[in-house]
């Protein structure tokens, strides 16, 4: 059989916040705030190790799949004046690394070193203000700065016999990843982020 070294992260945070303010005689104001932060390190690799697979592939795989979801709603009512405000901030700053650092890696099949990051952030804001003078607003901030790395270094010796089935490898982006088949040694880092603020 083959050898697989893998690490993955599927962190998910959801936050919901609501505020209601009512002033029968006078003014009303309300504010809702939510902040989410995911900052993880995902590492799969070998360091100064000897990996030998005489019957298959050697795969080193690091994957990041983080999700932030913020939903905020605010309602304010004041006879004379009303104000409602919402603010949401979503940070995803992961580091995903797949590596062969020194040592020797020999496979009868293929050797793959793959790091893949796909992070999703969604912020939904809503405000309702009712009064003689009414103000409402919302601010959503998405901060996505994840890093994806795949490498071979440290004087490592890597050999792949390219026997058996080919690897399906991401090749290009065209409104979605396209794939291609490859044999031998594959070193690949990919990153995809998606954010929606409403």
What are these regions (language model features)?
Residues 1-198:
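Low-complexity, glycine- and small/polar-enriched segments
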């Amino acid at each position: 059989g083959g050898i697989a070294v893998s690490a993955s992260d599927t962190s998910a945070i959801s936050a919901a916040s609501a505020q209601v303010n009512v002033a029968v005689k006078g003014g009303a104001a309300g504010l809702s705030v939510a902040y989410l932060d995911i900052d993880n390190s995902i590492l799969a690799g070998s360091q100064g190790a000897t990996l030998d697979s005489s019957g298959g592939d050697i795969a080193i795989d690091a994957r990041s799949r983080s999700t932030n979801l913020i939903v905020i709603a605010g309602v304010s009512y004041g006879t004379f004046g009303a104000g409602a405000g919402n603010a949401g901030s979503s940070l995803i700053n992961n580091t995903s690394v797949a590596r062969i650092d020194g040592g020797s890696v020999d496979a009868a099949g293929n050797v793959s070193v793959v790091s893949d990051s796909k992070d999703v952030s969604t912020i939904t804001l809503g405000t309702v203000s009712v009064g003689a003078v009414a103000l409402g607003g919302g601010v959503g901030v998405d901060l996505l700065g994840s890093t994806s790395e795949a490498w071979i270094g440290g004087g490592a010796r890597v050999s792949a016999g390219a026997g058996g089935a080919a690897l399906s490898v991401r090749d290009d982006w065209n409104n979605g990843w396209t794939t291609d088949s490859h044999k031998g040694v594959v070193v690949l880092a990919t990153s995809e982020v998606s954010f929606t603020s409403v």
